[in-house]
Amino acid sequence: MPPADSNITDLIVASCADRPDAPVYAVRNGAGGWVDVHFTAFLTQVRAVAAGLIAHGVQPGDRVGLFSPTSYAWAVLDQAVWFAGAVSVPIYETSSAHQVEHIVTDSGLRVVAVGSEELGERVAEAAGHAGVDVATFPLTDAGLAELAEAGAFVSDDAVEHARSLATLASPASIVYTSGTTGRPKGAVITHGNFVGAAINVLHFAREVVQWSPETTTSRTLLFLPLAHVLAHAVQVICLYARIQVAHSGSPATLLDDLASFH
């Protein structure tokens, strides 16, 4: 395992240093195809969004909610939360206002990124019932661009300081169950949990992600909700291993996405 005072972002930064030109994500180009996002470009965007979070008052250890369908923007914000030293709290997009209220109060959420106006209204209803103030911002490409613009005055050193504060024992994410059999239950996933999963899957179960040290052509299409801990972990593992990931955010587009991203 890496040093105890390191965290999952150190593993990601080191992987990027090894292959900065690796295509780690693919996004739709609007014409039925996909465009590569290379590692350096991805981390540049992550750092800019992390600066935006810091500019909006997010402090190390704060909880940041992600309430949105599976998407590239989700992947960017997830890493940006960690680069800001904060803790991600994924929320299933199917969660009711009552379930969101429980997650807000249980985790201490004060800011939530939402994938749609309707999800934002659900957060507002939940916060109103809970009697707490919860800020929201859109978890979209445009929303992330606005966040990055807001962080333009935050120095690279400030982001790097925030990024380096967490250790392997620090919380990285609070993952909640879907709530189908009762109140959603939260489990704290540490930076060490994600680091251990990334290293051990590649070492002992590399066939899970079709990875080998000799190839950089493996690709994964993620369609599970990223609020699900398996999908969340697979995304982190793939980024560390430089396995290219694309996202399918709706069952309606899944077959087309599978056919075009292969």
Tell me the role of every PLM-derived stretch.
Residues 64, 81, 112, 171, ...:
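Conserved S/T- and glycine-rich ATP-binding loop of Class I adenylate-forming
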Residues 4, 24-79, 96-101, 105, ...:
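Conserved AMP-binding/adenylate-forming core of the ANL superfamily
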Residues 106-108, 130, 260-262:
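Active-site charged/polar residues at nucleotide-handling catalytic sites that mediate phosphoryl
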Residues 20-23, 152-176, 182-183, 209-219:
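Conserved pre-ATP/AMP-binding loop-to-beta segment of ANL
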Residues 65-67, 74, 78, 82-113, ...:
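Short beta-strand->loop structural element characteristic of the AMP-binding/adenylate-forming
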Residues 31, 118-168:
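ANL superfamily adenylate-forming
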Residues 195-219, 224-262:
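Conserved AMP-binding/adenylation subdomain of ANL enzymes
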Residues 36-40, 172-199:
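Conserved AMP-binding A3 loop
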